């Protein structure tokens, strides 16, 4: 899949999974997204779940041909995205790994090594030149882990948004974005609204035309719509006006009372 003339999708779909993170039902599977940014030098954006490492490494080789990657950029250390880091570093011994300082601490714990001789530590507004383009790194702590960074490609105006703007579902299943993106946000990121708000403020200063998340489809059109939704969700505002009545009813009597209350509210103009 071409994201642009120089950015290729190299991720995988997982239809074997039934519960994402052991708790979220995903009837349409999951996508673990990864991207190849090709310039004078080549950067691979994040890895995939270790169970799909062979497929992913094959995708890299198919896209790159005779070329070899120069950098692996690790934006997020959750195992569905970092699980194949060690396999990548074995397969491409000349490549360097780019990540935040906290991410390298996690690598030491996860893999028994932090790739000391091959690491590039980045922080807020640090840059990496690939040739004709420059990647800028933006810290995004607690969106939704402490080590997270996102990456901006100033040439193609692409934001690699880590878990931001992600959704449940594999990419080979067509479905509406909002429902599963909302469920993903509430379950995965929802408690970190202030952190998301801080990241949205940083993103507002960028000219973004494409958003490449780690789950779900690449967003290329009407970005304001998606950003506005994220602003609403992360500020804990309501998408629509309305009243929710939460109840349980052992014998059915509370249900009857709730139905009467709902009817009274409707008659008084509540949506």
Model-derived regions, located:
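Cofactor-binding loop segments of dinucleotide-utilizing enzymes, especially the Rossmann-like FAD-
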Residues: 12, 100-102, 163, 246-250
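Active-site neighborhood of phospho(di)ester-bond hydrolases with catalytic His/Asp-centered motifs
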Residues: 45-47, 69-77, 97-100, 159-162, ...
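Short, glycine/acidic-enriched loop or turn micro-motifs at the edges of active sites
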Residues: 49-50, 79, 166, 218, ...
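N-terminal beta1-alpha1-beta2 submodule of the flavodoxin-like/Rossmannoid cofactor-binding fold
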Residues: 224-271
